[in-house]
């Protein structure tokens, strides 16, 4: 025991010796002043700053409160940070995930997976709990629970237990019951009991009930106008065999249609059921046929008008060409007459020229003969004188 007690003071002295040597080393490094409330500020805007080039001279570790510290050439670990964030050397960033701040440029995510930029997120579990709490009185709960953000349970997809889901989906957060949920659930339940082959109707009703559940979970109850618009509009089925009765059509159907007033317009053959909404108009088959016939007649009339215009244009061009041909024929005839007259004059001039040439040649020949005779006489007289 005595040896162990003697060894412990020696170890304590050895351990205290390095601790006494460390303070001079740490005291030589100046520690920067850090304000405790800097982590709660979003001090950097989302605009990316200009490029930063590190200087070769080591800067002061006590950085300016509005400037970044020296950026290292090599990142200390992992990938380098984004440009919009300063390097984490001197200033510490607030430990907040992107989108958690209400005024951040990122959308805030809600627990059910739907982004909400306004910052108001509703939990699907709480809304679903309220609706289930209000609608579970006197009703059995579904064996399969609905998960958060899911599109629907297995019963809705397969088309079973549509009555319970329709009634539960009809109850919204405000306690109002939408008419579409009840009507869809009743029609789907009756169809499943009457005939097991109407799977498509069950799927459609399940989709409508799923949409109502999602709207009630988001805290939006359908308004009376929306409930009225969701009601099914019944249209009278027309007989498929034989031609569909419609108003008689003629060539002036367009003029009659536009000229008649509202009071004199013929009544439609289609019938609207008493359950139809006054604001919604169900187009019947005769009305559609009348519109198609009217469009066809208008198209035919426009084609006839364009053909008539083109025919008149061609006729006018032909008449103009015929008139020009007549004028050119008359000019050609006059030119031919003038050419024939000029040719006659030319022939007359040629005959006169030939006659003049003949006269001139005869006169010259006579003068030449007379000159030769005179020369011969003079030469005979000279020879007689020489002989004498």
From Swiss-Prot:
Question: Could you tell me which Gene3D superfamilies the record lists for this protein?
Answer: 1.20.5.170
Annotated region (Disordered), positions in chain:
1-41, 103-316, 348-388
**Does the record's keyword annotation contain Nucleus?**
yes
What induces this one?
Induced during incompatible interaction with the fungal pathogen Puccinia striiformis. Induced by abscisic acid (ABA), ethylene, cold stress, salt stress and wounding.
Comp. bias regions, Low complexity: 117-129, 180-193
Q: Where do the record's region annotations for Leucine-zipper lie?
A: 321-356
Q: Where in the cell is it found?
A: Nucleus
Which controlled-vocabulary keywords does the entry list?
Answer: DNA-binding, Nucleus, Plant defense, Stress response, Transcription, Transcription regulation
Q: Name one GO cellular component term.
A: nucleus
Q: Report the GO molecular function annotations.
A: DNA-binding transcription factor activity; sequence-specific DNA binding; transcription cis-regulatory region binding
SUPFAM superfamilies recorded: Leucine zipper domain (SSF57959)
Which positions fall inside the bZIP domain?
293-356
> What spans are recorded as compositionally biased (Polar residues)?
16-31, 169-179, 214-231
Q: Where is this region: Basic motif?
A: 295-314
What pairs make up the disulfide bonds?
none
Q: Name one Pfam family in it.
A: MFMR_assoc
Example GO BP:
defense response
| Expression by tissue | Highly expressed in roots and at lower levels in stems and leaves.
* InterPro entries, per the entry: bZIP, bZIP_plant_GBF1, bZIP_sf, GBF-like, MFMR
**Where is there biased composition of kind Basic and acidic residues?**
302-316, 359-369, 375-388
Which SMART domains would you find in this protein's record? BRLZ (SM00338)
Q: What does this protein do?
A: Probable transcription factor that may be involved in responses to fungal pathogen infection and abiotic stresses.
Q: Which family does it belong to?
A: Belongs to the bZIP family.
Q: What is this protein called?
A: bZIP transcription factor 1-A
- Organism from which the protein derives: Triticum aestivum
């Amino acid at each position: 025991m005595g040896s162990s007690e003697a060894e412990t003071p020696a170890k304590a002295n050895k351990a205290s010796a390095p601790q006494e040597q460390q303070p001079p080393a740490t005291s030589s490094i100046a520690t920067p002043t850090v304000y405790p409330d800097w982590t709660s500020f979003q001090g950097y805007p989302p605009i990316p700053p200009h490029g930063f080039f590190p200087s070769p001279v080591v800067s002061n570790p006590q950085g300016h409160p509005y400037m970044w510290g020296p950026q290292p050439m090599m990142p200390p670990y992992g990938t380098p940070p984004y440009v919009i964030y300063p390097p984490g050397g001197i200033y510490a960033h607030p430990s907040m995930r992107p989108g958690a701040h209400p005024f951040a440029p990122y959308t805030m995510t809600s627990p059910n997976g739907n982004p909400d930029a306004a910052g108001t997120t509703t939990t699907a579990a709480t809304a679903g709990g309220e609706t289930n709490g209000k609608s579970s009185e006197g009703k059995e709960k579904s064996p399969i629970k609905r998960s958060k953000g899911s599109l629907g349970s297995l019963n809705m997809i397969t088309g079973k237990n549509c009555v319970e889901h329709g009634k539960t989906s009809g109850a919204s957060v405000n306690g109002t019951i939408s008419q579409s949920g009840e009507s869809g659930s009743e029609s789907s339940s009756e169809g499943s009991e009457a005939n097991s082959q109407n799977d498509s109707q069950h799927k459609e009703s399940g989709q409508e009930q799923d949409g109502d559940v999602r709207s009630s979970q988001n805290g939006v109850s359908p308004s009376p106008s929306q409930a009225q618009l969701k009601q099914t509009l019944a249209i009278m089925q027309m007989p498929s065999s034989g031609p569909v009765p419609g108003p008689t059509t003629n060539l002036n159907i367009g003029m009659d249609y536009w000229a008649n007033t509202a009071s004199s317009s013929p009544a439609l053959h289609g019938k609207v059921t008493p359950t139809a909404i006054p604001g919604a108009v169900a187009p019947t088959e005769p009305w559609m046929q009348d519109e198609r016939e009217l469009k066809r007649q208008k198209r035919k009339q426009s084609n006839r008008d364009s053909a008539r215009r083109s025919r008149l244009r061609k006729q006018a061009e032909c008449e103009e060409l015929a008139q020009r041909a007549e004028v050119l024929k008359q000019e050609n005839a006059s030119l031919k007459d003038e050419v024939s007259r000029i040719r006659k004059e030319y022939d007359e001039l040629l005959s006169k020229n030939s006659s003049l040439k003949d006269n001139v040649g005869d006169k010259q020949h006579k003068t030449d003969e007379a000159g030769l005779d005179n020369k011969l006489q003079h030469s005979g007289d000279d020879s007689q004188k020489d002989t004498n």
